[in-house]
Amino acid sequence: MYPEFECWIYLHEPSVPKETVHALQQYTNVKIILKTGDLITEKPMMWRFEAIDDPTVDVMMSRDLDSRFWRREQYAVSEWLKSDKVFHIMRDHPWHSSKIQGGMFGVKKTHISWKSLMDQVFQDKQTRVYDQTFLANVIYPLYRDSLMIHASFHKYEGTECIDFPFAHAEDDYRFVGEYVYADETRNRVNRDELIRGYI
């Protein structure tokens, strides 16, 4: 789907079986970054944001490991990459209510150091959405003047939001950020909620 990109996977070494790590390392376009430490204090959902500070990285796209790629995402990303906009946001389901979904955005390299910002910001140990809180409160204002936003719902920015290249109905109501479930019934529940969003 993204042949010019390398997939960086951040793993908590004590929690992931060595066999899994070894299997992932067999892919030539995959880089494994092993992390350690307490999962509460280390804030693992933020690890993936560190990539944009790497000197070899010009463009970073943050995705959840348990979500699928669909062509509607690919088309939207292509539109952004061809533009002069620095930051890309996607919201494609009624449940995508955050300004920036942690696994549905992209950013081009600028002078901004994300790691420095993350080190400065205190995150509540109890919240499960600390990554999206950081993105909304710290990152969003910094890139506010250079956004491309593909949004099917929650168009907070009004006319600045643009539609995805084609309708959900053309893809059986699949959506960007859709999770991978072994039980297709759960997938159907999510798509039914998407359909209700149009009613």
Regions found by a protein language model. Name each.
Residues 66:
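Short conserved active-site loop signatures built around small residues
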Residues 1-38:
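N-terminal anchoring/stem segment of glycosyltransferases
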Residues 60-62:
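Short aromatic/hydrophobic "clamp" motif used to bind/position activated sugar donors
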Residues 19-23, 51, 73-77:
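A short acidic, amphipathic alpha-helical/loop segment
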